[in-house]
Amino acid sequence: MPKLYIIAGCNGAGKTTASYTVLPEMLGCKEFVNADEIAKGLSPFNPESVAIEAGRLMLQRMDDLLSEGSDFAFETTLSTRSYVKFIERAQAKGYFVTLLYFWLPTPEQAIERVATRVREGGHNIPSDVIRRRYANGIKNLTALYIPLCNYWAIYDNSSADEQIRIIALGGKDITTHIEDTLSYKTVSYTHLRAHETLAN
């Protein structure tokens, strides 16, 4: 059975860093499709200028890998519904879809993480964009993507010592197991609060 891994979380959550460890060492997945890395390849000194082209190339590569039936992973903030149909297509082709979500407790921590990345030479993302993606990502995580994926896990990646903690896991045929009740309730509460904010 081919495998699709979705590495998700807000900007600054440590998705890319975690994926380079988790994917090859723990999951045996060598193919990681990342629009940010594609953009760096196209324009190393100004990756933001080629973001649209990088996104297009990312989607094309994902389609190619899906057609080949290869195992692969991609990175996303889940801030839009755009991957729902792609996941459904993958499952129709027999893929087992795993969602790994790296969570930060607040958008402020995400903003600070991105600011640190910029100071170290990384690419910038405006604070208002980070806040919007943070709220939309958690809303879509709970409302759309968790019910859709075959297996999911939420991790707390907020620790300064880079220790990733499991919050909860579950799946279509897996009973939900909550390891950190307080954090899991916080994720759920953040989703409800984000839904109210977006509705107003």
List where the protein language model places each region.
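The conserved Walker
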Residues: N11
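Conserved lysine of the Walker
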Residues: K15
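Post-Walker A alpha-helix
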Residues: A18-S19
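Conserved substrate/cofactor phosphate-moiety recognition/catalytic segment
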Residues: L23-E68
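Glycine-rich phosphate-binding loop used to anchor ATP phosphates in small-molecule kinases
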Residues: E53-Y101
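A glycine- and Lys/Arg-enriched "phosphate-lid" helix/loop adjacent to the NTP-binding pocket
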Residues: Y95-L144
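Conserved small/polar residues in nucleotide/adenosyl-binding loops
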Residues: V114, T190-T197
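NTP-dependent small-molecule kinase module
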Residues: A143-R193
